[in-house]
Amino acid sequence: TATDISADALAIAAGNAREASLANVVFVEGRWTEPVQDRQFHLIVSNPPYVNDDDEALCALRFEPRSALASGADGLDDIRILAAECAAILAPDGWLMLEHGASQPAAVASLLSDSGWVDIACHNDLAGLPRVTVARRNVTQARSKPSETS
């Protein structure tokens, strides 16, 4: 199951899935976990927006919408939402994997820890930069539905 708030992004992803002969992917439009609240997953992989709103690189955007990259003053607004919401749709001991900026591993780990996640670890990308953090849902972590304000 793949979710995105953008119908255009989902159309591109669906085309990519067809080209890769991936017939078992379901594409659902909606914000983060909202469209899949009735499902349970063992793994969630997310490439959320993680760039600071005032990052100068955003001025050079030609193809991607700003909302696909920018996420608040520190670039972590969407990661905060995911840290809070994903436990509700993960199986016990399920895993969350988040892409983030190379300068953000400590902040992401702190957000996840504060939200009850365990076994938090950051991994380098192919360029050797710390860009992916994984965390396991603590079996005692609350499984409440996301708030309507997220």
Positions of the model-derived regions?
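Flexible, glycine-/basic-rich loop-and-beta segments that form/coincide
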Residues: 138-150
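S-adenosylmethionine
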Residues: 1-138
